Amino acid sequence: MNWLLVIAGAMVGAPLRYVTDRMVQLRHDAVFPWGTFAINVTGCLVLGLLTGAASAGVASPHLELLLGTGLCGALTTYSTFSYETLRLTETGAGFYAAANAIASVAAGLGAAFAGVWFAQALWA
């Protein structure tokens, strides 16, 4: 049963990542990989909210599997973040590579902490 929840979440997360990335990149035709950045920060926020909800006792383990492992696991993409950072470096866009690495980690952690804080404030 648990693996079905993960699959169901991933069936939404993977296409959502693809469509969101394409839409953001079309809107922001830039060297910086805004699509992947937006997706990963959003995924961190959702995981933070889910973690806060679980610690408050309002998110079941099944919901964690569906949204956390399935949806967010398929939505977020560390491999694409790494690949895009490497490609920026290889094409001479070292500043953008460094900005991507620093901003992605900082914004992702900030979003995760904000999600936990907001969920705990809401359900505490």
Curated annotation (Swiss-Prot):
- Where is this chain primarily localised? membrane
Keyword Disulfide bond attached: no
**Subcellular location, record wording:** Cell membrane
Tell me the Gene Ontology biological-process terms attached to this UniProt entry: cellular detoxification of fluoride
Family from the record: Belongs to the fluoride channel Fluc/FEX (TC 1.A.43) family.
Q: Which HAMAP family match?
A: FluC
Name the UniProt record assigns to this protein: Fluoride-specific ion channel FluC 1
**Organism source for this protein?**
Streptomyces avermitilis (strain ATCC 31267 / DSM 46492 / JCM 5070 / NBRC 14893 / NCIMB 12804 / NRRL 8165 / MA-4680)
Q: In the record, what lineage is assigned to the organism producing the protein?
A: Bacteria, Bacillati, Actinomycetota, Actinomycetes, Kitasatosporales
What's the encoding gene here? fluC1
